[in-house]
Amino acid sequence: MTRLQDDFYHAINGEWEKTAVIPDDKPRTGGFSDLADEIEDLMLETTDQWLAGENVPDNAILQNFIKFHRMTADYDRREAVGIEPVKPLIEEYKKLSSFSEFASKIAEYEMSGKPNAFPFGVSPDFMNAQLNVLWAAAPSIILPDTTYYTEDNEKGKELLGIWREMEEELLEKYGFTAEEIKDILDKVIALDAKLAKYVLSSEESSEYVELYHPYDWADFTKLAPELPLDSIFTEILGQVPDKVIVPEERFWTEFAAEYYSEDNWELLKASLLIDATTIWNAYLTDELRVLFGKYGRALSGTPQAWDKKKGAYYLAQGHYNQALGLWYAGEKFSPEAKADVEAK
């Protein structure tokens, strides 16, 4: 028997580890995972009842969840519709002829939830949590971290190969020719390699104090002169911001002017096309849902996708997780129990 002082982990967990099994559609197991699995089983069983019209909660938001869940679970309908809902979106992006044309539509794309390469968001100010301010992030990279892009990182090359293979299969499903697929992916990977030189690594991102870089709006707009930030935000907000916090300062000061430019348009357009072909995959056929998860499963070491039932539940749950969480709390943590905890 392992002694505590020799190997604390195995002394405590050794017997459990011998029989523990990681489910094929999960990346891990353990105490917290077991609890999550129990909650998942409860929610799947409960929502099955709701779909069948049984024990439906008297809550308008949850009733809307049930309606949406019924749609996500209707795989016959999803198969019949196929990729038709996404075709107009793909054609719209194919027809974009220049960066200036794209830039003139960024506000429209942002407000309609379409791909837009516009990495802005609103969050509390580090210096005053009562105040929400504008933050300028950076476009995301393909690999998990900038360290995967070094020449000697074999895992990065392996993952990029898996990503490319997945995208080749997806683009073929959307009717792109082999020549078009190669051209698009070559351009996307080229832009991604450039971008990885300027975005923050995971280690840098964890240094929260170092991420606070406030800019006056007039100074910030000069960092990407071809990006019409004033007109974009005026269309979205009705005014221009006073200031912006820039955690991804290296991207904005050293690369944004090139990234958001006519000279970079062909590479950026390829990236937008990829986004247009993937943004709604989870809502379409089951084949596309599973295929689109291939790269994510490689990252997490999960060998198997969720089955249809879980896929439909989590797709619907993602939009109603707060309402479902409150329902669960009400079922499992009564007001009396809450008061008892608060009193101790």
Predicted regions, residues:
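Extracellular/periplasmic catalytic domains that process cell-envelope and extracellular macromolecules
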Residues: 1-4, 126-128
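Noncatalytic, helix-rich "gating/capping" subdomain that lines the substrate-entry/channel surface
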Residues: 48-344
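Active-site-surrounding "flap" and adjacent substrate/cofactor-binding loops of secreted or lumenal enzymes
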Residues: 3-7, 11-77
